[in-house]
Amino acid sequence: LDIGINAIQAVSSKQAIFINDECRVFVIGDLDGDLPALKNALNNVNFDPERDTLFCLGDFVDRGDKTYDLFTYLQAIRACMILGNHEHLMLESLLSNDKAAFNLWTDNGGNWHKSVSSEKLSVMCDELLTKPLSIVLEYRGYIIGLSHTFAQSWDWENYPDDKSLIVQSLLWDREVVKQNKVVKSHGVDFSIHGHNSTKAPFWVGNSYHIDTNYYGGKPTLLELSEVIATLD
């Protein structure tokens, strides 16, 4: 991994969450700073933040100029956010003064930060550091892995000790999709990821890849019960 992990070192690698069966649970792919697209997707399913839960698979920052507003909105609706490689770039750029990270960040949609105050950016970074690199969700009898991406032969029950390897595997890896091998997401019934841009969601083994915002023109919002219904 060419980008340092000084800032992201302290972030939790995995968070376990249980949600009652009667609750509606949604998962959304990369948002790329597009607040109107998020609101439109949620309105289409009559999302109620008092009753429903939203999981974001990372890369909610960058590209769109509404990144800061999008982040505060996600907080307001109590969305469960997972970090992606763009959040990693932001944290290392602003907190670690990592020049390689900053150059890559600003070349790939990070320039929105120039119009946001340093105070707001500082608060945002502090909040991002409280978000995990992955979530293992128990819902309706299924164990579901959620992360920005994942590596071949990833074992959700046994993470490596090397934090840089975890970051590389869960935030940056593209080998599973590039090679299109039937790989298994070990230790979970299935897993859901963003990161790998596609026009339509697709399965590789028991992993589901839903980053449609870049090529498909809008983010994919899944209702988890509907995904589970196709597996039962």
Q: Predicted segment positions?
A:
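Acidic, histidine-bearing metal-coordination/catalytic regions of metal-dependent phosphoesterases
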Residues: 1-23
